[in-house]
Amino acid sequence: MDFQNPGLVWGLYAAGLLVFGILYALSLKKAGLNLLCAPLSAVFGVILAVIGARFFFLVPNLIFDGGSLDADTLATLRPDEMSFTGGCVGFTFGVFIAAKICRTEAKPALDAMALPGCVLIAFARLAETGIGFINLGEMPAFLPAVWPFAILNGWGLPDFSVSTLMALAALLCALWLALSKKPSAPGYRFESTAFILCSVMLFLEMLCTTSSWIPFIISFIHLEQVLCAIILLILMIRRTIQIKKAGPLIVTALLLGLNALMQFVQDKPYLFPLPEDTDIALLSVIVFALTAAGLIAAWFWAGKTQSSSVKGS
């Protein structure tokens, strides 16, 4: 794999796994769970993360773009031909398998993994700045054109690293988890983390102007956004079944629809009767940010509804 700064990439990956292992072991110890889950999760997680990242990239491309599977295609590990969200799904399955091997309940193990997982995501996202050609956007004038905010492109000009924002979002989520002491049902901590990160990812993906990492499915929707939307719907459907109220799910579906509509407006503004002086880029940022905030609010609305139901019973 041809990286712009291979030392930075592999160094951050290694550091991320080391920090993950330490934090996960501490979380497992605090929860009274088997400490062996930590090293096993790292091993199985990395293996399944690579498989998941490749699988969730290949399958949609085969469906929408055609092509065939062969040995060379399967063995290709180009970073622009892998899905970060798919990698996260694969890593989660690795943690699940490790918990089963250690005869540990999966939900508490995943809850214990939530904070260390956020830190690992932050390291992995920051490592993308060393790859050099993925998750790039237009450089904002108010930010310094230096690493980790800027990456020099092939013409020696700075591009904005959206991966850095994604890393910061993961760290903020980790901070929230560290400060959150409120007890919750098994699995809720992990599911909340996944929902928040996918909601933020849905927003930040729209800042990417490069499509090498995320192929387009319907000319204006990124694959990563589709995967995040599917995860959001699955999590909210599970929550809706538990609380037996459809309100949060309806809000989630409407917000995802609004997100897709705004993507279409951004791609083909001439099809919509907007004022001539409308700043499409600014409008998109506002709508996508509000959509992400609305999705997170809907999730905690569902969680509050579940808590009220438990108290009432």
What do the PLM-derived regions correspond to, one by one?
Residues 1-313:
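Hydrophobic, membrane-interfacing alpha helices
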